[in-house]
């Protein structure tokens, strides 16, 4: 464990979720991802996702497939990417730290998803497109 913490490639200050991945085929840079990177990435991802949803719901233009449905589908990419990597690592390399992170993150992520899915303004816009 001590050796891993001295590895200059694996420092908590360089959160790989906050940079574009320059890896082959865009795969996650697993050698640079540490457990302490996830909560800040989840928090930023949720914040960005909320801002993207707010942009959809506050759009004064008539609701269309493009500015509502496609925008909703495109929203939350950073959060989705972080959740995907987190899920893969929890399944493949679980340990006490990752399990503790799951216990901490899952209620926050569930509440975030509920907030988005139950957003009255978003529902109205989607219904306008449907009607």
Where are these regions (language model features)?
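Zn2+-dependent metallopeptidase catalytic domains
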Residues: 6-131
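Hydrophobic h-region of N-terminal signal peptides that target proteins for export
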Residues: 1-5
